[in-house]
Amino acid sequence: MEDKEEGKEENKEGNNNKEKTDNENNKNKNNTSKKFEMTEEQKKALMETFKKMSLARKAREVGGYDDVIKPEYKFWGTQPVPQFNEECKTEFGEIWKDHKVEDLDKEPLTLPEGYEWKDVDLSKQVEMDKLYEFLKSNYVEDDDHMFRFDYSKDFLKWHLNPPGYFPEWLISVVKEDKIKNKKKIVGFIAGIPVKVNIHGTDITLVEIDFLCVKKEIRSKRLAPVLIQEVARRVHMRNMWWAVYTSGTLLPTPFCKTTYYHRNLNVKKLVDIEFTNLPHNMNMARAIKKYDLPKDLPISGFRPMEEKDVDDVFILLDEYEKKHKVHGYYSKEEVAHWFLPRKNIIYSYVRTNDSNKVTDFISFYCLPSSILQNPKYKKLMAAYSFFNINTSCEFKDLMKCALILAKKENFDVYNCLNIMENETVFKDLLFGQGDGTLKYYFWNFVCPKTEPKDLSLVLM
């Protein structure tokens, strides 16, 4: 009995100690709670930090490491495109479905006083000259203001007047110059019809390109008005979808691609600061490293001719179908886009013993003005278009493309990491560029697409 009573006493003392400890713990918890209690302002700031972290992570996923998602997109937040900060109710297909041509405004959007709409007719030399000069002075340039795209007049006419184009989709905004008593272009946007297959669904849509506003008036927010006006005109043709690219991160790309560059004229590229020599390499070693043989590693390539259109059409059609998102062409479009034109498009074919085209190379010419160099005025860049092999190695095919571009006096060969292009970059000494090109659909939700699954080149 004594042992039991003694045990009870010990339990009682233990319970007292436990109660004391619990009280102290509760006291500490209360103190801790009071110590770390946040004000409403602190909570708001913390939530804002979490939001920024989430947006930064999203930017890396859909854009690039240098991309930043803005807290608000005043224009794009109102458009039928997937948004960064909300779940899209549509997993695939149209977002805005309730559309009818008869509900559209028949008149163009209202512009500020002194500005007016004007369609651009590229068959008229005066209008062609005005558009060329406007784009040459105001279109895309790099962040360091060293290079600016310089699309030639012939290139613009080729690109903007394809088979089936609509003249009213080439839109400018003009403003009267009272001193010179003439009207000048201050804004431009273009649309051309294209056919695209998106994960098995064929769609005819508009490719939006050459959105450009004069530098001095960019604060007037003319770009959204240009986009809305070309959209209105496209809708009048009962077309409700668009595809476009941008180096800027917008809501929301379905594919992020990267440019890679292969030096052809090393000395010039270093002189104009397009590229730099590694610390452990002098000019002589660099020239030797990037030197290309005069002869092609594969014999039999010749410039594409009219007689090759049918074969190239079949080759392109079979090749493009291997990709989840791809364009497709009619025979008339194959002839337009791929038959060689000096300083515009270069295409080569290789045939077998039966004179059937088995392999195909193409690249287009897009020079840039060099803005800060007294010696050089123009950078000649070849841009990879479509390259298809069925009877040779892809690496050998692409090496042929480099040699052919070098023979045409191009300084650099540029290539996106789409299709199977990336498989040869290391072996053929391509270097990664410092920017990304994002692909977007307007009013169409497409699953995220890897570059290798994309066969769509927008110029």
Predicted regions and their residues:
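Membrane-interfacial loop- and helix-cap regions that link adjacent transmembrane helices
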Residues: 307-321, 340-341, 355-378
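Active-site/acyl-donor-binding loops of N-acyltransferases
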Residues: 2-14, 22-98, 104, 108, ...
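Conserved beta-hairpin
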Residues: 167-189, 339, 344-363
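Short amphipathic alpha-helix that is part of the acyltransferase structural core
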Residues: 4, 8, 12, 18-37, ...
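Short amphipathic alpha-helical segments embedded in low-complexity Lys/Glu-rich regions
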Residues: 147-158, 244-251, 329-336, 415-423
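Classical protein tyrosine phosphatase
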Residues: 227-243
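A short, internal acetyl-CoA/4′-phosphopantetheine-binding micro-motif in the GNAT/acyltransferase core
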Residues: 174, 192-196, 208-219, 385-393
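Conserved acetyl-CoA-binding loop-helix of GNAT-fold acetyltransferases
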Residues: 213-232, 391-403
